[in-house]
Amino acid sequence: MKKTFLLAGILAVSVLGMAETSAKAAGQGAAGKEAVITVKKVENDPEAVALNFINAYYFNLLEGIDDSNWFEAQPLTDNFKKVYRNQERAIKISEQILDGKKISKADQEFARKYSVDYIPIFGATVFYLDEYSVFGMESYDQKTGIVTLKDEKTGIELPVKVVKVKGKWLIEGAGTVNIPN
């Protein structure tokens, strides 16, 4: 339950771009304190950008929240957004194919090119995550820009690629999006 509130807090801060958190959130133990620190340095810290985005994205996914407005407000490169949307479209085309609907050759090829298992970013890995999963920092490789996050509950790791553009850290890749196998 505390983690749900923590994720809700991270989401609210991400959406509003605020650096303040309530005293209650700061008092929720080690995980709460980590979130407070992460949120405060989000614009200057590639690890925090990755951490906040993935945890808020997973929270939205679990809650069934339509994340289109939230998604557009996140620190993402245009290339990330394009590939993400292409993966979403490929999934819809694949669902039509599975339903036996007639699909153009162009759509079939598009689906083959951008297809992912189940959903963008997490792919089929989402089935192995717990409903209370929260990602924490595992490592950051400054040379490659890869931040490796690890789910504290299941141990599942997720790579997130960050790049600095005009002094601001942006996400260029995450999981199935722009991260080579």
Regions found by a protein language model. Name each.
Residues 1-4:
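Positively charged n-region of N-terminal signal peptides that target proteins for export
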Residues 57-58, 152-154:
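Short, flexible beta-strand-to-coil junctions
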Residues 155-181:
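Short beta-strand edge/turn micro-motifs at domain boundaries
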Residues 145-152:
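Short beta-strand segments that buttress and anchor functional surface loops
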Residues 143-145, 167-168:
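Beta-strand-connecting loop/turn residues
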Residues 15-22:
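C-terminal segment of classical bacterial N-terminal signal peptides
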Residues 22-143, 177-181:
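Flexible low-complexity loop/turn motifs enriched in small/helix-breaking residues
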Residues 8-15:
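Bacterial N-terminal signal peptides
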